[in-house]
Amino acid sequence: MQVNDPVSTIMSTSVVVANKFHNFSEVLELFSKHGMHHLPIVDGNGHLIGIVSSNDLMKVFTKPEYKSLSLNTDIADKVINIPDIMTPDPITLSPKDTIKHAAKIFDEKKFMAMPVVDNGQIVGIVSVKDLVHLIAHYC
């Protein structure tokens, strides 16, 4: 494996996504059930419109406007809309982008994961963890 190989060679292809109409507790359940740290958000046509990180979920309970929520997801479901907590229009990779290019973005932007998109559809996700596994395997 070379740094000039495409990210498609290291990306995870079984990507769990949520749509913008999922409620807060459904998103929490996806994070918990799948042990994930990043959840791509799609519109009704399956096009990527945002991403929610585990940090975004934790920030909900520290924001003054959500202070009264405590850990009550029934109330949170009524008050919090996923588009309000997601990062809209996230930086993405193409399956043809190089591993080196992905590593550069991770370093510059301090991201931990990026969706891989082809023709507007999510085809994978690449994480810093994927790069660490690659380095460990080949060093």
Show where each model-derived region lies:
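Residue-level signal for alpha-helical context at structural boundaries
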Residues: 25, 45, 49, 75-76, ...
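The conserved cystathionine-beta-synthase
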Residues: 18-35, 42, 83-86, 92-110, ...
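A glycine-centered beta-loop-beta connector
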Residues: 31, 39-56, 106, 114-130
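Tandem CBS (Bateman) regulatory domains
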Residues: 1-14, 54-91, 98-99, 103-107, ...
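Short, flexible active-site loop motifs that bind/organize anionic cofactors or intermediates
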Residues: 14-17, 47, 92, 121-122
